[in-house]
Amino acid sequence: MIIEAKSAVINREIRNDVKIEVIDGVITSLEAVGTPDRIIDGTLIPGFVDIHCHGGAGHYFGSKNEAEIQKVIDIHRANGTTTMLASLVTEPLDALKEQIKRLLPFVQSGAIAGIHLEGPYLSPHKCGAHDPALLRDPVPSELQELLDVADGAIS
């Protein structure tokens, strides 16, 4: 596919009147030749990377419903986010493990880049929206349990 745009951000510079070739979702040329398949009347920019994302448009990564998790991903994709971590808030350890298990297939498929655990190991004096009653000091065996369940998905 050849995409033509009035301008594009490439290597930290704005270039005018560009044609970019994309094959299988990968940019293969920044100076494509040929008739464009798509013309963008604007500026083409790289996708957004969100490393702290709990959800979007009323949907939440901590949901027990996989369809709702997919809606979060779809909403972000439709608005320019190409890479994201699913952030989870402080919960009891068993609930966190279940949330991680639900998110794991989305990580394995590449739909999300990984899982961000925002708690439960936070200072009760700077816990933001987290329930202070659920915060606790890190325990190596608990951390290992979370890492084992996540199978490399915690980022």
Model-derived features: where do they sit?
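Histidine-rich, glycine-flanked metal-binding segment
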Residues: 1-45
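Histidine/acidic residue-rich metal-binding segments in metalloenzymes
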Residues: 33-36, 136-155
